[in-house]
Amino acid sequence: MKLVLSLLLLVPSLLFAELSVPHFFSDHMILQRERAAAIWGKANAGAEVSVAFKGKSASAKAGADGKWRAQIETGTADANSAVLIISAGKDKIEIKDVLVGEVWFASGQSNMFYTMNRSPEYAGLIAESNHPALRMFNAPLVTAAENQEDIAGVWESSTPETVPNFSAVAFFFARKLHLELGIPIGVIKSAWGGKPVETFTSREALNTLPGTKALVDAMLKEEASYDQAKAQAAFDAKLAQWQSTMAAAKGKSAEERKRLPKKPDAPKRPLLTEGKPGVLFAAMIHPFVGYTMRGAIWYQGEGNAKSGAVPYDQTLPLMINDWRKRWADELSFYYVQLANYHAPSTVPGTADAWALLQDRMRLVLGTTPKTGMAIINDVGDANDIHPKNKKDPGERLARWALTNDYGKALIYSGPLFKSSTVKDGAIRVTFDQSGTGLKSRDGVALKRFEIAGADKVWYWAEAKIDGADSVFVSSAEVKAPVAVRYAWAANPEGANLINSEGLPASVFRTDDWDDVEVKVDTSVLKAAEERRALGEEIRALAAERAKLDRKSPEYQALTKKHTELMAKFKEGAPKK
C-alpha cells in the first residue's frame, strides 16, 4: 500500500507541467499596441489556458506536449500599469506593471552591446534618465546547439541606476521614439560582440545559400570529428604554457606586460561555440520568435568585413527574411552602416573590404523592403572600432522609424546614390534624400570623390554641387570617365557631402571592380583545418609525454610518434 501511494504521489511530477511562460513575459514588460499580442508557455497537456488583460480575454488549449499559445488584443498605447493574468485550473500567473506601447528588438555585435556607462560624456544624461515608460529587456550571453524556447533576463525601467547597463544605441533609439511619440517604448536587446551575421541566422536559412551552406557544412564536419579529451589535453598544454609565461613576467615593466598573451579559452564543442553558424540564433534569437513587435534595429558588420566573406548584401537579407518568416510578420528592419575605422587613406582606388561592406549595406536598401540604414561616417574613431558616440547612430535609426512607421515628415537619411550619367568628360551623380539641397559640411570644396576611365586607374576628382540633388564630378586626368566612387575607404577622412539636415552621404561606387571578397579555395581551407587538428594532436601528445619518466618505454614510444607527427605537420606547411 505504501509503495502504491508513493508511486501515486510521483505521478504529478512525472505527467503534469506547472503553468509557465518564458522569462520575457514578466513584470514591467511592454506589449505592442493595437495588435493581438502573442502570449505563450507550457501547462498540463490538454489544459484550458486563459489570458486576461485590461478587460480583454483570450484562451488556448495546451497540446500533448504542454505547449499553448494565445493572442490578446492590447488596445491603444497606455502608460498606466496593468496586470496580465494567465490561468489554467488552479494555477495562475500574474504579470504586474505591464504597459502598452511600441516594442523593438535590438541585436548585433559589440557596438549594439556597448553600454551607456562606457561613454563618460553620457554621465550627466544618465543622471537625468528617469523614464518610467522606457524599458529594456537585456538577454544574457548564451549558446545552444538546438533552438531554445526561453532565455533568462528581466525588464527594467529607465532610471539612473539601470541605464548605465543599457545598450547605448538602443537607449538613444528608444529615447528618441519615447520623446517624439509620448508613449511607452520597450526594447528587447540580444547582442554579442565580435560575431558574424551568420551566427544570428538559423542553420535552415543558411543552408539555402551556397556560400553560407559551406560554412554550416564545415562546422558540422568539425563537430563530427570533435574529441573532447583531445581538446581538453590541448587546452591543458596551452594553459600550462600561459601560466608559465605569466609567472616569468612577474616584475616586468608595464610596457612589457602589455605584450603578454591572453589566457586561452576553454574548449567548446563547435555547436556550442559563439560565432559559429546558427549558434546564437538558436540561443539568443529563437526564444523571442513570435513576440509581437514593430521591428528590429541592428548594428553589426565588423565581423564580416574581410576577404573571403560571403557578400553582405546576400547574408544580411538572408537573416532579415529568416526572421520575418519565423515571426510571420514583415518587421521593419533598420541597421547602422559601419563607422570609419583605421588610419585615414590618402590614395584613391584602394581596394578595401570595409568600404565594400559599407556599400553592400547600402545595396540592401534596394533589394529588401522595409529596411533603413543610419549613415555614420562622420562619427567614427580611427583608433577604436567602438566609437563613443552612440547618440547619433541611435537617433538616426529612430529617424527611419519615425518617418516610415509613425508617419512623421522627416528627412530620415543622409544622401543616397540614385543614378549617374556620363557626359562631356564628366559624371553627374544624382542623390535621393538631399532634403532642400546638398551641402558641404565645412563649407569648402567637396572631397573624397574618385573618378576612373576604362583603364581602371583612379584619380581624386573635382566635385561641385549642381542643383539641389546632383554633384558634377570630373578630373583633368580622366578624359573619358566611366566610374565614380565616394568615401571609398575604411576611413575616408574629409568626406564632407551632407544634406540640408546635416546628415552625411553614404559611400557608393558605380563600378564593380576590386571585389576583395575573393572566392575561397576550399582545398586550402581543408588543408588548414587538417593541419590545425594535427597541431592539437601534437600538443596533446606533448602534454601527455611531459608527465612520463624520460627513460620509460611509454615515453620513448610517444617520442617516436611525436617525431612522426611533427614531420607530417611540417610537410603540410603553406608553401612560400
Model regions and ranges:
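Hydrophobic alpha-helical transmembrane segments of integral membrane proteins
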Residues: 8-9
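Positively charged n-region of N-terminal signal peptides that target proteins for export
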Residues: 1-4
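Cell-envelope and extracellular/periplasmic
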Residues: 18-566, 570, 575-576
